[in-house]
């Protein structure tokens, strides 16, 4: 991996659900968001980070949201929708896309922490706007589309002990 220019202004967008379910399904573990944020920034000028999270009716995730805030990550919260028949949904794809486009004006590098292939067109758009786009995700669950679209893909599975809280 190449050394990152320290003058680059960096924004980090974290698709919490994508990383959470990948870590749980692959390792039965929780994500170390502090380590991921440090990896993303890599000594460059940190401008902002957003974590896109889902709130349930019980509110049990509030301490987790507070922990993210203490790391300097702004939480974007969406309530979990429950539909007739028991289906549940809390899709952040459009929200992440809108934020990426809206907030990247004074940014050199957008770091997307998600393996969701639906973001490949967003990655292409940002690159066409002159932004460098780096993707951080779990290689086995990340879409080949997003891996190919990114200027750089970092596979969290290279160092699971660093990026996960293993049991």
Can you name each region flagged by the protein language model?
Residues 1-92, 132:
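Domain-level signal for Mg2+-assisted phosphodiester chemistry and nucleotide/NA-binding surfaces
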Residues 57-167:
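Nuclease catalytic cores that cleave nucleic-acid phosphodiester bonds
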């Amino acid at each position: 991996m190449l050394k990152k220019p320290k003058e680059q202004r960096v924004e980090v967008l974290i698709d919490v659900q994508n990383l959470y379910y990948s870590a749980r399904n692959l390792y039965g573990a929780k994500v170390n968001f502090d380590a991921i944020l440090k990896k993303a920034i890599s000594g460059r000028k940190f401008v902002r980070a957003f974590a896109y999270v889902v709130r349930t009716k019980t509110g049990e995730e509030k301490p987790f949201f507070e922990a993210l805030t203490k790391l300097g990550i702004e939480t974007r919260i969406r309530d979990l929708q429950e539909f007739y028949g028991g289906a549940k949904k809390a899709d952040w794809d459009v929200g992440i896309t809108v934020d990426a486009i809206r907030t990247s004006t004074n940014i050199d590098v957008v770091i997307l922490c998600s393996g969701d292939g639906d973001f490949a067109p967003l990655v292409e758009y940002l690159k066409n706007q002159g932004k460098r786009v780096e993707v951080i995700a779990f290689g086995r669950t990340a879409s080949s589309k997003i891996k190919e679209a990114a200027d750089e893909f970092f596979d969290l599975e290279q160092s699971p002990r660093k990026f996960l809280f293993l049991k």
